[in-house]
């Protein structure tokens, strides 16, 4: 008898946090339990590399997505199709805001879980929390800095099932130091500092400062994760550039210290695997990275500054370069080291995915009653809170939609790329003779990093033989045609179409047909 099927849905965060937590849980589920992923994150290729079926759907802020209203309608239809085809026993959402298309479609799933991390900014909007009761259960991944949590979720822990901090790997999965050094191309046995501050304009200067300071130090090797130096024009010669290293924690035995941002993943991996670090918090709308960094420094497990512009970075790097200082931090880390909550979360989720035993209305794990999706009822207070959020944001929403309608670029050219590599896709993009933001790419490939970085909007159709196509049943050509119809729904007519790989002529004709005729051809 086949085991339960669980669909993990993640939002488009600023890093890999949402996806990594979901994969950490999925890889510890019973082997009879099937995991599927739907994500709005461009890190979808990582999910595939880890062996999980994944379907990427572009987020509302992506090029060619159109207005929020058009995106929401299109996303609702796509999610509904994915859920109907997969027929999961349980849906797990990891993100800050459960978006409307998800809420509209997850009613079809027997049980739903919001994986909702804590440590929100004290002033963060509480509007997302008014949607908590629309889920059957809340899972809260623990935070090492939980005692410093002054955000809005800190008073709502009684509604959540909390587990220890979730990290991707277990101790036994880390490479021994010699093996890690060899795979990364590092000089064996030399003290090594890792720099992984992420990317973006706010961190470029801080990254450059860190690399310059560390590269001048005698007897120390400096390694920078790929994202940390992307966009930098001047990388010191002594810095080792690390590429394709996910999960980075697999190589942590090679490092004696680190300079790191303080997102959930990086922070808890450093703490869990006892890496003395200088934490540089980034400003985020919800995640209180500053609180994490300050707490870690206050209990002696790390060094911290206030942010990427902090003038004390060089001084703190001097402390990090001190072997005795690192040794003291490592001892403290070993003393306070938290458990990995991924396995406990997996067992809890598996229990939710199984229907209650006959005669019971609840599971033994203490979650709310589970219905068939149609029986969920929100409390009057929660419905009133959501209604108030809706009413008070009407003027802002109308203004935003009007601005989007007037200013957002509309795609004029579509590239259909099936069975094509990225070189062929780039060639088609160059032949388009249109600004990249006016080109919509529809492809069965996720190896399109350069295309994404060029600013081209992309949508994904699972390839032949992939699990999503199998679950849909029937002929693959029909599956692909339906997916293309959902992707193009509500979009204006496209003037031209280019192809890469093997694309049937009827798809090209349908893609460039007037919207009404296009809908009939692709339905």
Please tell me what each predicted stretch does.
Residues 79-97, 488-503:
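Short N-terminal targeting/anchoring amphipathic segment
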Residues 9-21, 46, 202-203, 416-427:
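A short, glycine/small-residue-rich beta-strand->loop->alpha-helix junction that serves as a flexible
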Residues 2-14, 28-81, 306, 452-471:
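Conserved nucleotide-sugar phosphate-binding/catalytic loop shared by glycosyltransferases and other
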Residues 178-257:
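Donor-nucleotide binding loops and adjacent catalytic segments primarily
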Residues 121-124, 131-192, 197-199, 390-398:
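A nucleotide-sugar donor-handling region in carbohydrate enzymes
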Residues 253-266, 275:
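Acidic donor-binding loop of glycosyltransferase active sites
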Residues 266-315:
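Catalytic binding pocket for nucleotide-activated donors in carbohydrate/polymer assembly enzymes
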Residues 315, 321-404, 521:
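C-terminal amphipathic helix plus adjacent low-complexity
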């Amino acid at each position: 008898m086949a085991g339960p099927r669980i669909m993990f849905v993640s939002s488009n965060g600023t890093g890999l946090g949402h996806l990594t937590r979901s994969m950490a849980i999925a890889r510890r589920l019973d082997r009879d339990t099937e995991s599927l992923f739907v994500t709005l994150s461009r890190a979808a290729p990582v999910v595939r590399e880890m062996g999980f079926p994944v379907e990427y759907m572009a987020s509302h802020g992506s090029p060619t997505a159109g207005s929020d209203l058009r995106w929401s309608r299109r996303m609702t239809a796509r999610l509904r199709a994915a859920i109907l085809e997969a027929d999961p026993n349980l849906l797990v959402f990891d993100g800050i805001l459960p978006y409307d298309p998800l809420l509209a479609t997850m009613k079809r799933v027997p049980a739903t879980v919001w994986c909702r991390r804590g440590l929100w900014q004290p002033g963060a909007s509480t509007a997302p929390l008014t949607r908590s009761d629309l889920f059957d259960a809340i899972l809260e991944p623990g935070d090492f800095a939980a005692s410093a949590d002054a955000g809005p979720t800190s008073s709502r822990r009684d509604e959540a099932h909390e587990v220890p901090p979730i990290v991707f790997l277990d101790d036994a999965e880390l490479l021994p130091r010699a093996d890690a050094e060899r795979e990364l191309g590092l000089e064996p046995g030399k003290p090594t500092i890792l720099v992984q501050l992420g990317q973006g304009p706010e961190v470029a200067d801080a990254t450059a400062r860190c690399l310059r300071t560390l590269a001048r130090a005698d007897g120390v090797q400096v390694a920078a994760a790929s994202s940390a130096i992307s966009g930098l024009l001047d990388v010191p010669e002594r810095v080792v550039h690390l590429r394709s290293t996910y999960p980075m924690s697999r190589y942590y035995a090679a490092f004696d210290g680190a300079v790191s941002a303080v997102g959930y993943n990086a922070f808890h991996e450093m703490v869990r695997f006892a890496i003395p670090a200088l934490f540089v918090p980034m400003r985020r709308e919800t995640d209180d990275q500053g609180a994490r960094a300050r707490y870690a420094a206050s209990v002696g497990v790390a060094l911290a500054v206030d942010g990427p512009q902090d003038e004390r970075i060089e001084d703190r790097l001097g402390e990090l370069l001190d072997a005795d200082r690192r040794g003291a931090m490592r001892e403290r880390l070993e003393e306070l080291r938290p458990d990995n909550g991924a396995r406990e979360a997996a067992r809890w989720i598996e229990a939710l995915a199984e229907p209650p035993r006959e005669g019971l209305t609840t599971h033994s794990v203490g979650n709310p009653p589970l219905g068939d999706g149609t029986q969920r009822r929100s409390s009057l207070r929660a419905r009133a809170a959501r209604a108030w959020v809706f009413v008070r944001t009407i003027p802002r929403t109308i203004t935003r939609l009007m601005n989007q309608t007037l200013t957002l670029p509309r795609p004029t050219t579509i590239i259909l790329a099936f069975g094509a590599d990225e070189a062929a896709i780039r060639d088609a993009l160059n032949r388009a003779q249109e600004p990249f933001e006016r080109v919509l790419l529809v492809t069965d490939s996720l190896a399109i990093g350069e295309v994404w970085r060029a600013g081209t909007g992309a949508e994904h159709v699972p390839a032949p033989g992939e699990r999503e196509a199998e679950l849909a049943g029937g002929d693959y050509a029909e599956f692909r045609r339906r997916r293309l119809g959902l992707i193009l729904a509500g979009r204006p007519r496209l003037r031209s179409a280019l192809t890469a790989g093997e694309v049937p002529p009827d798809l090209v004709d349908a893609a460039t047909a007037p919207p009404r005729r296009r809908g009939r051809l692709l339905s």
